[in-house]
Amino acid sequence: MKKLTTFTLPGFDKVAVYDVIKFLISEIQKDLIPTRARSISYSFFIAFFPGIIFLFTLLPYIPLQGLQESLISIINEVLPKNIVQNFIVFTIDDVLNKPRAGLLSFASLLTLFFSTQGVVSMIGSFNKSYAIYNKRNYFQMRWLSLKLTLILFVLFITSLVLLIVGNLIIGKMAILLHIQSSITIFLINTLRYLIILLLYFVSISLLYYYGPSAKKKFRFISVGSSLATFGSILASLIFTSYVSSLDNYNSIYGFFGSIIMFLSWMYVNAFVLLVGFELNASIYYNKNLKHQLEDEESDDYE
């Protein structure tokens, strides 16, 4: 039993895994993580609509053939099929088939505003894990959220370019360099997805590192960001598999059912993101507590 309560892992700063899990369970039981996840998912859900409008209104200005089909194909790989067919594609078709003057600038402003609001909501959730409330004033919070939003947008566009243009580049490289080996092409594709995974990891690490208004920061490369990266991918795969089996649910509720499923998918990812942050917060909390107890023991000894 003693070994169980003292066992630790790399990246835990010698904090026992038992103490970390105990802290996480207590936070979930208090309903703090689920409540914050609902708030974050709702904020980003509102930002999704103008984001889609902005992205697909921008497509005609990009001189690449088959760009729309490639983008829909990528969305289809990430999100459950039922959501894509009844919800995403419906929105995309409406944007492309009914062009509206001035929509690009309006959609970009709305996307920026609501995305920034989502980051504000996320930072607020992070601060509650530290028991820190509103240490930054309104303008400081907005400015930080805007900077993080713009950085995340650049990382997102980079990932999107790698996904969409990657196949085209690989095809041309294969022709120019006379690459015929399927293993070589597979390795190049694997490298491309590893870079995208790295960009996703960096995005989460940026939020964990710069988001909380704490004097002492987490490590940029942390256990929590690793858990959130792989956890969200695994959760999305499980959720996609589960939703794909609910054909009756989709046929009954149709478009509104797709909205509910999309919100649920965003909630699951927000929940995993907060669990990753709570893991870092638990290590931080228990490490400080351990140091305090050691200091008190040394004072008593003296």
What feature does the model see in each segment?
Residues 2-302:
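Membrane-embedded alpha-helices and immediately adjacent juxtamembrane helical segments
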